[in-house]
Curated annotation (Swiss-Prot):
Organism classification: Bacteria, Pseudomonadati, Pseudomonadota, Gammaproteobacteria, Moraxellales
Subcellular location: Cytoplasm
Listed GO CC annotations: cytoplasm
Organism listed in the record: Acinetobacter calcoaceticus
Principal place of residence: cytoplasm
Induction info: By heat shock and primary alcohols.
Protein's name according to its UniProt entry: Chaperone protein HtpG
Job description of the protein: Molecular chaperone. Has ATPase activity.
Length: 16
């Protein structure tokens, strides 16, 4: 999302 990870945050946000 913001500063997490452009790869992990993408799946993390969509999953949540």
């Amino acid at each position: 999302s913001e500063x997490a990870s452009q790869n992990y945050s993408f799946q993390a946000e969509v999953a949540q």
